[in-house]
Amino acid sequence: MIDLAAERLAAEAGAEIVRRGRSEFCERAVVDSREAGRGDLFIGLAGEHLDGGRFASDAMSAGAWGVLVDPDHGADLAGEGAGEAWVLSSPDPERSLQALGRA
């Protein structure tokens, strides 16, 4: 379990809260949307061939606690879904993941 409340998690990650979710704590972080489920924070990393942020909506549909994506994807996701998932935005999701690893 990630032992950080949502606002502290965002602060540690250097991320902005774009939309608040329902649950205060997430259980784990994942970078593969196919593995995302209830309680997970999906982090959309940009790769050589794919931008993981494109799959954040899939993670939310799978019940993810929230998503951490770049600002463009964050703006797109702000109004998506029923409002259960947190949407966090960071200019560099990879750096945010590293910061969470140190927190």
Question: Can you say where each PLM-predicted feature lies in the sequence?
Answer:
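Short, basic phosphate-binding NTP loop
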Residues: 2-103
